[in-house]
UniProtKB/Swiss-Prot annotation:
PROSITE patterns documented for this protein: AA_TRNA_LIGASE_I
Keyword annotations: Aminoacyl-tRNA synthetase, ATP-binding, Cytoplasm, Ligase, Nucleotide-binding, Protein biosynthesis
Gene name tied to this protein: argS
Enzyme's top EC category: ligase
SMART domains listed in its UniProt record: Arg_tRNA_synt_N (SM01016), DALR_1 (SM00836)
Protein's name according to its UniProt entry: Arginine--tRNA ligase
EC numbers: 6.1.1.19
Pfam families in alphabetical order: Arg_tRNA_synt_N, DALR_1, tRNA-synt_1d
Length: 594
């Protein structure tokens, strides 16, 4: 199915052609088209053009208007103010364009693939081995997953990377404990479902961590053996590596159980942790030192920046290799840049990482550019995100002041949502199985939407009462909008959705139709700027237009002519398909009945 040009892009082209025809001296002028309250669109470009040509803007506007093709797209065009063009489109053009979108059998609603698709390596969802995931891990996972879905929909080749924390001195302590307590990682009972297996894995890892830490802090001989074990691990001792792999594998069971709850796909080949770059660290440091990008300072290998200074005014370096010979995080991150550009052929590197790490990544990117690993043809972007706050506006903690476990947060969201679904279940006729399933979809959707409807860089308050509210800017409001349309379509009987371009549209129908047509342009903007909150805003506005449409336009009224019923069914069905597709791109499910 060929892509469908939006009404705005078609009008933009017609106006640009008219500008060229009427004012050949203007060159390639931009009409500066935008949506307007005065008409469907307003073009403001003539004002600047008149200054350039030293002409009367209203007279120039009249010349451009005369050069526009008659009929078809434009119903009315009015010159207002100092040469603004207020353009109203024909109802036929709106319905015919929407009909072309509805006819797209590939489920893309006529949205084109982008012309300049490349390869993006996106680094997101980065938990730590042998440690529980907490609320701080939520945003990278949710934002990253949505960006992956959106980029892939636009045609980008996306390579996912989960840079898990799977290396470090703490593994000496854990592995040494396992050597001295061989059964420490065994679970009680047999295998269960993914969630219970994950819970058992984390429970075991927690116990081993606490017991090994207690021994490490109290027993000097065990501490010495643990430090020797770190040396053996870093030297690649096979027996030590085998036990290290057990901790990684046990942690992956837990990771997958949490991501399954989040309704996210995490694939093992995409999990490339810190250890995945160990073989590159020495070469990375050697190249940096040989090229003069990094220099020795007090025994450490450092990269300095004139604009990065501490409170004392001295330059603060990026430490690539420590005085004791150990490698800093920067060495791993720089090795990852080399791998992703040279081996994975990325032309965009995208890091979905906490805003508090912005300075680190700015220094890493600049170092990589100095070393020639990031050329002018490769873009490196940190998609920085803010903090999850509690209702009190402070970082989200338990009542005891502890960090909130991510699983507990998700479980509570599902419980709250299930109660909301159950309240409506009898009226809709939901089975217990549907109540449980919808509760999961609504709860997880509420958590994701609260995050994604906020600009990533901003902090946001985690308020479950607000998240599962049936009204306002929430995912459940959008899910109910979708389910209501599906209910109308089931009740339509013999009437079928069908476009009728010959009909005159009511104001609410026009507003809904014009908004539906913007879907592709919104996705293009969201994909370019990595801003899923703009897609969330578009979907909320779509649901709001739908509510106005219901208030002003009866769909299945017996007073309506058959063609009016069919046309309105067509509009709501296309709205449902757009909601379904848009929510799926945010990683949120849309139940058929709710």
């Amino acid at each position: 199915m060929a892509s469908v040009p939006s009404l705005a892009s078609t009008l933009q082209q017609q106006l640009a052609d008219a500008l060229t025809a009427a004012l050949p001296d203007a060159g390639a002028a931009d009409p500066l088209l935008r949506r307007s309250d005065r008409a469907d669109f307003q073009a403001n470009g003539i004002l600047a053009l008149a200054k350039k040509l030293k002409g009367n803007p209203r007279e120039l506007a009249a010349q451009v208007t005369a050069a526009l093709p008659a009929g078809g797209l434009i119903k009315d065009i009015e010159v207002s103010g100092p040469g603004f063009l207020n353009v109203t489109l024909t109802d036929r053009a709106i319905v015919e364009t929407l009909a072309a979108r509805a006819a797209d059998g590939e489920g893309r609603l006529g949205v084109p693939l982008k012309d300049d698709a490349g390869t993006t390596v996106i680094d997101y969802a980065q938990p730590n081995v042998a440690k529980e995931m907490h609320v701080g891990h939520l945003r990278s996972a949710v934002i990253g997953d949505a960006v992956v879905r959106i980029l892939e929909f636009t045609g980008e080749n996306v390579v996912r990377r989960h840079h898990i924390g799977d290396w470090g001195t703490q593994f000496g302590m854990l592995i040494q404990y396992l050597i001295e307590h061989p059964g420490a990682l065994q679970h009680e009972g047999g295998p269960g479902d993914g969630a219970s297996d994950g819970e058992a894995a984390m429970s075991t890892l927690n116990r081993v961590y606490k017991e090994s830490r207690a021994l490490f802090d109290s027993d000097e001989e065990f501490k010495a053996r643990s430090r020797d074990r770190v040396v053996a691990l870093q030297a690649g001792d096979p027996g030590t590596l085998e036990l290290w792999h057990r901790f990684v594998d046990e942690s992956k069971i837990y990771f997958h159980s949490v991501f399954d709850k989040l309704d996210m796909e995490i694939r093992d080949p995409d999990i490339v942790g810190e250890s995945g770059y160990n073989d590159m660290l020495e070469e990375t440091c050697r190249i940096l030192e040989e090229t003069g990008v990094a220099v020795r300072s007090e025994g450490a290998l450092c990269v300095f920046f004139d604009d990065v200074k501490g409170p004392d005014g001295n330059r603060v370096p990026l430490i690539v290799k420590k005085t004791n010979g150990g490698y800093g995080y920067a060495a791993t991150d720089l090795s990852a840049v080399r791998n992703r550009v040279q081996d994975l052929k990325a032309d965009t590197l995208l890091y979905v990482v906490d805003a508090r790490q912005s300075l680190h990544f700015r220094m890493v990117f600049e170092t990589a550019r100095r070393a020639g690993w990031l050329g002018d043809d490769v873009k490196a972007v940190q998609l920085a995100f803010g903090t999850v706050l509690g209702k009190d506006g402070k970082p989200f903690k338990t009542r005891e002041g502890e960090t909130v476990r991510l699983e507990d947060l998700l479980d509570e969201a599902v419980q709250r949502a299930t109660a909301v679904v159950r309240d409506k279940a009898e009226k809709v006729g939901l089975s217990e199985e549907e109540i449980v399933e919808n509760g999961r979809y609504v709860g997880i959707g509420a958590v994701k939407y609260a995050d994604l409807s906020t600009s990533a860089v901003r902090d946001y308050k985690f308020d479950l009462d607000q998240m599962v509210a049936l009204h306002g800017d929430t995912s459940v409001y959008l899910q109910y909008a979708y389910a209501r349309i599906r209910s109308i379509l089931r009740k339509a009987g013999d009437a079928v959705p069908a476009a009728h371009p010959e009909l005159e549209l009511a104001p609410a129908e026009r507003a809904l139709g014009l908004h539906l047509d913007q879907f592709g342009e919104v996705l293009a903007e969201v994909g370019t700027g990595y801003e899923p909150h703009k897609l969330a805003a578009y979907l909320y506005q779509l649901a709001s237009h739908l509510t106005t449409f219901y208030d002003q336009c009866q769909v299945l009224s017996p007073d309506n002519a058959p063609e009016v019923v069919e046309n309105r069914l067509f509009l709501v069905e296309l709205t449902a398909r757009t909601l379904h597709r848009g929510m799926a791109l945010l990683g949120i499910r849309t139940p058929e009945r709710l």
